[in-house]
Regions:
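Auxiliary, metal-adjacent structural segments of Zn-dependent hydrolase domains
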Residues: 1-60, 122-131
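Non-membrane alpha-helical secondary structure
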Residues: 4, 8, 19, 104, ...
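Conserved aromatic-histidine-acidic binding/catalytic patches
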Residues: 8-19, 69-76, 100-108
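Well-ordered, non-membrane alpha-helical segments in soluble/globular domains
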Residues: 18-26, 78-82, 109-112
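Hydrophobic, glycine-enriched assembly/anchoring segments
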Residues: 142-175
Length: 175
């Protein structure tokens, strides 16, 4: 695998360099500019699950499996990478003070999923639909209800409350 890592990293890096900055700008527009990290460490790991990843908020680090091709073509790995990176600043007290730290990683992942799909649509990486959200929940192994997330996201987009308020509301909806 060590010899294969450059082959596995290359396409993802190229896609990120081409679309990642615009993707993150859209995340800031859709949610809160404070979510944009100045830098993040991306660790590419062995593809044990055939596509997977995790955001580790305290270290501003994401781990993503190095797959040779998108396991789910309608959900490109570069969107997964952007989704993971978009979670990293959600541990800022101004954004998450009303969410218990033990629940924050789960709430962060769920909260940023519809934003990531919307950002992906804006930079022409994916579509943004309730069906794709449900597919992302399944394929990216999130324990969440697509209907609840869709309702939360639509309510957020209509009213645009501070993202910290929306995050706390999502936490209560998931309880």
């Amino acid at each position: 695998l060590e010899e294969e890592l450059p082959l596995r990293i290359g396409p993802l890096r190229e896609q990120w360099e081409a679309r990642g900055p615009g993707f993150l700008r859209q995340i800031g527009v859709l949610t809160d500019e404070r979510l944009l990290v100045e830098q993040a460490e991306v660790v590419v790991i062995h593809p044990a699950l055939g596509g997977g990843g995790e955001a580790w908020l305290p270290a501003n680090q994401v781990r993503i499996e190095g797959v040779l091709a998108n396991p789910f073509p309608q959900l490109p790995e570069v969107v997964r990478l952007g989704w993971l990176i978009s979670q990293l600043n959600l541990d800022l007290p101004a954004l998450s003070e009303n969410v218990h730290p033990d629940r924050l990683p789960r709430v962060a992942g769920i909260a940023m999923l519809p934003a990531a799909l919307a950002a992906g649509r804006e930079v022409e990486l994916c579509q943004d639909s309730p069906e794709l959200l449900a597919q992302a929940i399944t394929n990216w192994r999130l324990a969440a209800d697509a209907i609840v997330i869709t309702q939360w996201w639509e309510t957020y987009c209509e009213g645009r409350p501070p993202f910290a308020v929306a995050l706390a509301a999502l936490d209560k909806m998931l309880d």
